Amino acid sequence: MAYAQIANQHGLRSPENSLNSNKTCLYHLGVQKDVKRATISYANNTRKPEVFEKLFYSLSSALDRNGRKKFRKDFYGIDATELSLNLHDFPWATFRSTKSGVKIHLTYDINNSLPKYLFITNANEHENNTLKKMNIAKGCTVTFDKGYCNYAVFGDFCRDKIFFVTRLKENAQYRVIEEHESRNKHITLDRTIEFTGMQTGRKCPFPLRVIKSVDEKTGKEITILTNIFNLSAGYIAGMYRARWNIEIFFKTIKQNLRIKKFFGRTENAVKTQIRIALTVYLLYMKLRQLCIYGGKNFTNFMSELKVCLFERKDLFEWFAGSPPPVVYHPNDFQQELWA
């Protein structure tokens, strides 16, 4: 299945044919029999996705996260992306009368550009019901859109010393406790507030901070809600805008990995394929860290790797972008022929 991801195969017949056309290479990999699509299909539908879940987390934990950080330590973005499915082929994932779909919920390490934690649900699962399931540890900082607004969870975050940066809902009721001055020209408001709504005040009875920031490129103003008081308003606004990195990640994997078309129709097959796809991305990141420098982005990496999967070459030299040595043959008859 990882081969099908990298080689951008369509259906199970395609990887079956292409793998069997390289039998000598498969022999050196320990595969002594022909690859059968029935075998792949059976494994895809019956092998528990928890196996690939453990592989994903094992590889994720092995990646180096000690590089240079743009933001504070343990800073994560939380978001979800929906994958549309055919209602007729995937009836188990129905969430509208005419549509099926699944949703990938992801915790993303913004400083290191790495997925950290994920789970997959039916597409009708709303974000504000999943925030408490995102496996956020004490002392971490998370940023997410206002679709995740859940005042009870915000209260739990304050109790557990988990820091968050999100957007304030327009209808939120609160009273101002203190106004703060800011020398940043892009910060129009900075204040400490307390919720006064009957439900919000009970669920989150802690002082919070509201910041209004104007984007210097678009001129759009956003209202940010956070429980961080020891950082500047401009820095916190930058933390919220860094949430866009997770959107770029989703766009990248959708363009370069097969997670919009599936090889199997069962829930097990869909979840397995998604986890294997993200494991392929982690393998890319591991290779990038092992090289002296990462000379290829993920798009270039995938487009070049799929045409040389069965070639014997030094991956580290190739990945770092070292050009092949020029070999001169004085008796090159081909050159003489075309001279």
Where are these regions (language model features)?
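Major-groove recognition helix of helix-turn-helix-like DNA-binding domains
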Residues: 28-47
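A short, well-structured juxtamembrane/interface segment
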Residues: 60-67, 127-128
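DNA-recognition alpha helix
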Residues: 11-29
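Hydrophobic alpha-helical packing residues
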Residues: 19-22, 59, 253
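Single, function-defining residue in the core of a domain
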Residues: 1-14, 44-47, 54-55, 70-74, ...
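A glycine- and small-aliphatic-rich helix-loop capping segment at beta-alpha/alpha-beta transitions
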Residues: 93
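Short Lys/Arg-enriched helix C-cap and helix-to-coil transition segments
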Residues: 51-62
